[in-house]
Amino acid sequence: MLDLLLKNGLICDGTAASPFVGDAAIQNGRIVELAPSICADSAETLDVSGLVVAPAFIDMHSHSDAWFMADGRCEAKLYQGVATEIVGQCGSSCFPRSVSQMTKVRRAAEEGKLSKMEAYQAGTFEKLLRKRGPEDGMSTNLVQLVGHNAIRRGVVGLVKRPAWEDEIRLSKYLLQQAFEQGCWGMSLGLGYLPGLFADTHELEELIRLCYIYDQLVTVHMRDEGDRVFEALDEMIDLARRTHAHIHIAHLKLGAKSVWGRAEALYEKLLRAREEGLELTADVYPYPACSTGLSSRLPDWALDGGTDHACRLLAARGREHDEILELFREKYPAREDGDRFYIIGTGGVCPEVDGKTVGQLSEEWGLPVPETMIETLLRTRCQEDCIIFNMDEGDVEWLLRQPGIAIGSDASCRPFDPAMSDGK
């Protein structure tokens, strides 16, 4: 006897086969048959006419790392049918941390300056796992990547320079250690600190190690806007040099100058795959990304970290003027400001939470470029934004292409309001 029989649902089996109306038989927690009509005894039978029957989803790009540690219910993902998440993305992971980094974490915790999420940091992946006890449940499966930015921050710091050879050797040791402790690959965050300072030699050395261990490399590319084609070329070249499986995270055309060129971007990816390179990608199912305003700053402004960037902006000198000119060129109009929606600042500047840069521009009586700088200063570069920087036509076209997966770029936040402090 079956445990559960689902009748008359629209079955999408996840193999790219055409959907069909039919039945799904489930026994011992597994799907045992899919067919247009199944006649069998079942402990429970449900008529699911008008509903879609599909396997649970794999979220190819997730940032649930610390949220999963804090609350294993994972309701925000589970209620959307997601059962597996690939985490540790964009170069960011809760580990590894150097001894000096962990000393600072403990000191901040003692002084009450550590947020709930910041508490989930550890020297190694193994030590991170110990922060969850055997009694702690888990609602989704997590596939953990180790972040290159996390490695580089502890080994090189936030300075703008190539890694020295001894630093590359230490980085490779930490990467190998993460693999041996159970990580499934490495993520690159080449648009964020400090990964944006990594040169090709450093990346090639680390990616080659991923190939040796048969591990995945996911990449937030150096540019996803005006220079997205050049950024993709860099990844294709690295795939050619290392033979590793490189997966492009949230492939997008995130600037007006490249809107409408989705087919050309995908064609570049396709030609590389036809060459025999193992290149894949995921995209958003929406025309917005999630990041901070500080990601719009030039790399020289971030040499030394976001604190350094804030000092440059506050000084109102030559560097401030150069950044302002850049913003005037890229975001001149009110509609550009309305594309930046600030979802939170972690309690640093509640007055901007839930508002667009366009709204703040009107409130403060400043043009949009000046408002962006003022927002960075008031929030100390601690703002999280949703940025509507894509053309819906491009997104829809990419979603229809073979070899393209879907990633949310989101976290498995619980529904408990107490878990959303600072929002």
Predicted segments with their positions:
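Histidine-rich, glycine-flanked metal-binding segment
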Residues: 2-56
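Short hydrophobic alpha-helical runs that function as membrane-insertion/retention elements
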Residues: 85-87, 187, 218-219, 247-249
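Divalent metal-coordination and catalytic microenvironments
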Residues: 9, 29, 50, 61, ...
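Active-site environment of divalent metal-dependent phosphoester hydrolases
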Residues: 65-68, 92-95, 191-195, 223-229, ...
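Core domains of carbohydrate- and sulfate-ester-processing enzymes
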Residues: 118-127
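Active-site neighborhoods of metal-dependent hydrolases
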Residues: 128-133, 138-165, 172-192, 237-240, ...
